[in-house]
């Protein structure tokens, strides 16, 4: 049961990341490469100046990648805390003498609720990241 829930979240997050990559990150990569190429075309610039120019071109993409990584880590941490709470409740129930089957059902139900709650956060998280990526790209 938990594996099925994990797969649900994984597929939703992968879909979100693909969408961000296709609609936002890819455009930023194109800008970065074109910007870097123009740095190399300046025949009057020193090697150091060209290097600094290229570094400046990479900044927005690096910021975008850091933003996406940070948001995904926060999401993953929240989901992990929720499922850890479910595990703690299950352990407490076993310690209190509850039947194993009953505890397993409670655990599955709790984990499913965690996943459902976090699946609802994905559209808002996606919107927030897209807005942030657009502001980085400006």
From Swiss-Prot:
**Keywords carried by this UniProt record:** Acetylation, Phosphoprotein
UniProt entry tagged with the keyword Phosphoprotein: yes
The superkingdom listed in its UniProt entry is Eukaryota
Residues modified as N-acetylalanine are: 2
User: Matching Pfam families, A to Z?
Assistant: DUF842
A GO cellular component entry from the record? mitochondrion
Q: Which residues form a coiled coil?
A: none
Membrane-crossing ranges are none
InterPro entries (alphabetical): DUF842_euk
Which residues in this protein are found as Phosphothreonine? Answer: 124, 126
Supply the PANTHER family for this chain: PROTEIN FAM136A (PTHR21096:SF0)
Tell me which family the UniProt entry assigns to this protein: Belongs to the FAM136 family.
Can you say what this protein is called? Answer: Protein FAM136A
Task: Specify the species.
Answer: Homo sapiens
User: Lineage of this protein's species?
Assistant: Eukaryota, Metazoa, Chordata, Craniata, Vertebrata
